[in-house]
């Protein structure tokens, strides 16, 4: 499937309910069989939407870059966000926080464009669920490597790894 017709744009407060729905749908799909089923079933679209409202209401003072992915019909099909690293021991100053896409957006090329827009050519780190083979393959293709950092998802204990992308000049 080609990327034709897919668009990126910054989110607005009016997008928060849809973002909450998409965010939870992506998690339920991507982490099925990886995270506990009861945890995924309990994810709240309303709480996610409220969290998005909170984030976006403070966004003007933040260097964080967040973009929505709109499919050819104009519906929200995902989002991505990056900003200053949150780790005290971060090997880079910039962190890719998230790239979340609904299944129909995967394989279209829009994830590459999204990553280019929110991270650019800078060095960056990210955390990814260790068992999320699809995401790890995407990040590896984009120059990220496992740098040895390990953590656990706070609510589930699911293993996470830190990946880093270095820029050679």
Region locations from a protein language model:
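Terminal substrate-recognition subdomain of acyl/acetyltransferases
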Residues: 2, 160-169
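Secondary-structure boundary/capping motif
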Residues: 49, 53, 127, 141-142, ...
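Acetyl-CoA-dependent GNAT
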Residues: 6, 10-14, 21-34, 38-106, ...
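Conserved active-site alpha-helix within GNAT-family acetyltransferase domains
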Residues: 108, 112-113, 131-158
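A conserved catalytic-core signature of glycosyltransferases
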Residues: 35, 96, 128, 134, ...
């Amino acid at each position: 499937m080609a990327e034709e017709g897919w668009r990126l744009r910054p989110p607005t407060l009016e997008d928060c309910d849809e973002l909450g729905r998409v965010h939870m749908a992506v998690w339920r799909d991507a982490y099925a069989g990886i995270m506990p089923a009861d945890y995924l079933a309990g994810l709240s679209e309303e709480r996610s939407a409220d969290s998005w409202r909170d984030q976006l209401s403070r966004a003007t003072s933040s260097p964080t870059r967040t973009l929505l992915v709109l499919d050819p019909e104009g519906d929200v099909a995902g989002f991505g966000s990056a900003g200053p690293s949150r780790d005290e021991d971060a090997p880079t100053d910039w962190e890719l926080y998230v790239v979340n896409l609904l299944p129909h957006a995967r394989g279209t090329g829009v994830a590459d464009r999204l990553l280019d827009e929110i991270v650019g050519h800078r060095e960056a780190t990210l955390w990814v669920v260790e068992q999320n083979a699809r995401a790890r393959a995407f990040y590896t293709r984009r120059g990220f490597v496992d740098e040895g950092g390990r953590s656990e998802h706070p609510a589930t204990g699911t293993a996470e790894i830190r990946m880093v992308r270095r820029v050679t000049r």
